């Protein structure tokens, strides 16, 4: 006999619904605490009963998954983005959501999310953290330039590039001469911004070093970096979010996972392909598209493909580069599956398989 349990988890409380054939649905509410979850599941388990648990993916779902793995027979982490049509009801409560999850689990209709191991989740989190540091550096630089322009300094003093070491020293000198009058308050602000910039740059250096060292432990990294134009940042993101290449049985599924396949709108005899779905990890999608721009300059076959898709129309450049990015993912999937190094023959050999 099986019990299907749905957890509706938020930061403070968890609502559990137990669905079992021939019995009335049962609800329980408790604090979002691993020990209380384990105690609840222990109460539900009997020698002849198998517990099947589901809850939605969230920031804490990985930790919950690992902690409860030994308390139930199976755990399914659901994708709420693919269940929006199910939740379209006039009434929405935590109890209703928990029951819907349990019922969907009982009929095998939960859109499942792949749950990687802890070290892979930490790898992904570090990649995302580094990306945010890079974004913070860009924001601080833009604020510094805007501040200097607001006081009439429209260009750097030493070289054309604002961010050379010489210009950085020049900005430090500007910030080092504040007076006590309000007219020079901008210099204090500049000093704070330069301190922020130095801190972010130090953090970027440290996180990059850590990621570089970890990437060296991945056997597939050197394989992917044989593709001209693909460096360590793209490689680590692809490997971290791919995790297990065997879970992608087709090229289309691999490209769709990273949100690079077009949306489909079909009705009757009308079939329309729209913009790319942009689902999945945005960090990989952005990096692989940036890599595609570099690859078309170094790979004759992909350059030819890019030009064929563009068809001599400059306004089709973005469409063409997205097509190249899909080809890159197809090549990467083939390389990770077969262990082959990159060569131009791979493009014609694997890129037209589904």
Predicted regions and their residues:
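Gly/Thr-rich phosphate-binding beta-strand-loop-beta motif of the actin/hexokinase/Hsp70
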Residues: 1-20, 101
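Short glycine-rich, Thr/Ser-proximal phosphate-binding strand/loop in the N-terminal lobe
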Residues: 12-36
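Short, basic/hydrophobic alpha-helical segments
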Residues: 34-52
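Acidic, metal-coordinating catalytic cores used for nucleic-acid/nucleotide bond scission
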Residues: 54-64
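Short alpha-helix plus adjacent loop in nuclease-associated cores
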Residues: 77-114, 121, 125, 170, ...
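Basic, amphipathic alpha-helical segments enriched in Lys/Arg and hydrophobic/aromatic residues
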Residues: 312-354
């Amino acid at each position: 006999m099986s019990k299907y349990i749905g957890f509706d988890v938020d930061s403070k409380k968890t609502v559990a619904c137990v669905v079992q054939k021939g019995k009335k649905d049962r609800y329980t509410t408790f604090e979002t605490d691993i020990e209380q979850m384990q105690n609840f599941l222990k109460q539900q388990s009997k020698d002849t009963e198998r517990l099947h648990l589901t809850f939605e993916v969230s920031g804490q779902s990985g930790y919950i998954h690992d902690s409860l793995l030994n308390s139930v027979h199976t755990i399914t982490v659901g994708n709420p983005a693919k269940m929006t049509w199910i939740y379209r009801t006039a009434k929405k409560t935590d109890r209703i959501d928990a029951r819907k999850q349990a019922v969907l689990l009982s009929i095998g209709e939960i859109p499942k999310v792949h749950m990687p191991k802890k070290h892979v989740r930490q790898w992904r989190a570090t990649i995302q953290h580094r990306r945010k540091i890079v974004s913070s550096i860009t924001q601080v630089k833009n604020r510094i330039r805007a501040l200097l322009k607001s006081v009439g300094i429209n260009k750097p003093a030493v070289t054309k590039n604002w961010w050379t070491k010489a210009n950085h020293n020049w900005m430090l000198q500007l910030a080092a001469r504040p007076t006590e009058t309000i007219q020079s308050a901008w210099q204090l602000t500049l000093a704070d911004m330069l301190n922020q910039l130095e801190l972010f740059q130090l953090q970027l250096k440290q996180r990059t070093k850590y990621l570089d060292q970890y990437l060296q432990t991945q056997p597939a990294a050197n394989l992917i970096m044989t593709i001209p134009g693909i460096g360590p940042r793209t490689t680590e993101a692809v490997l971290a979010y791919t995790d297990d290449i065997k879970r992608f049985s087709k090229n289309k599924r691999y490209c769709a996972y990273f949100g690079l396949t077009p949306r489909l709108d079909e009705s009757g005899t009308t079939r329309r392909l729209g913009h790319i779905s942009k689902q999945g990890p945005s960090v990989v999608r952005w990096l692989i598209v940036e890599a595609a721009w570099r690859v078309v300059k170094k790979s004759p076959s992909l350059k030819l493909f890019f030009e064929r898709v563009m068809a001599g129309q400059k306004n089709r450049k973005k469409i063409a580069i997205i097509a190249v990015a899909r080809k890159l993912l197809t090549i990467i999937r083939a390389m990770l599956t077969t262990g082959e190094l990159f060569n131009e023959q791979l493009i014609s050999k694997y890129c037209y398989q589904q």
